[in-house]
Amino acid sequence: MTNLAVDFCGIPLEHPVINGSGTFDAIAARRAFGDELLRSFPFSAFVSKTITLEPRAGNPPPRLWETPAGMINSIGLPNKGLDGFLERDLPLLGELPVPLIVSVMGRSQDEFKALVRGVAAPPEVAALELNVSCPNVESGLIVGEQPAETRSLLEAVRPITEKPLIVKLTPNVAEPGAVAGAAEEGGADAVSLINTLKAAALDPASLRPWLGAGSGGLSGPAVRAVAIHQVRAVAAAVSIPVIGMGGIGSGAEALDFLAGGAALVAVGTENFRDPAAGSRVCRELREELRRRGFGSPAEARGLSLPEPALNLRSRSS
């Protein structure tokens, strides 16, 4: 019998399948499906959509463009801001039957510190994800594209909380392992990747940009090969757990990410096509592991790396 249970940064999870931030609206899903959602929640942990210090309206429409193998989004992180999240969303998310990971993004170290301080305090929050894809207003640099900026940010927020800090990495860099290593040096407990790839779409009639913001981020099956490559590179570069994501739509594809060194996998774009994707991927992953003779996800972890899994399996999750 294959046991899917994993320990992630000291948080026990029933299985390694979680959601990508902003791809599954648990509050809306509960309104639609009622308490049945709580009885059969599709993920072992829930990652909130990214919140910012102040409310954001998001980008102008149009915001989505479907591609033959995925989609380009330019949502722009619309959210209620920190106070609105704590007052209105957190009480509802706190009722979910799984650990809650809250994603935050600031424009400066001071904003990140305020967000971490506010989000880490409530007992409902198990861990925080730092979205480092926004330009720093002080340096003009995108934090997650610069190892030194990433390390500096982690050093600034690490003393604020003992709860796990996960750094969400951008794929739009030449050496993701260097950024991940800097995050680890700064005190990160885990990293997650990949975020979306920079992309654009043109209106076939006008030959002008279709998206209201001009460009956006590509996700879905089109990015899966890139994601696996970067997960492997990062898993080989750090000793902290890796959450792998990017175009996962089946258990076999989830297993590829585990073999690439991921401790957890996240389902993202597939949730828009199939709201029950998390549960299905989990079932299929269990069967894939059983069929191949693995007794747990850990037994498959890192098998594709140059020195298979022995190093990864010895690491604490």
List where the protein language model places each region.
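Glycine-rich phosphate-binding active-site loops on the catalytic face of alpha/beta enzymes
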Residues: 48-53, 128-134, 190-200, 247-248, ...
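Glycine-rich beta-to-alpha transition loops that act as phosphate-gripper elements at the mouths
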Residues: 103-106, 169-175, 224, 240-252
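Extended, intrinsically disordered, low-complexity segments
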Residues: 224, 279, 283-317
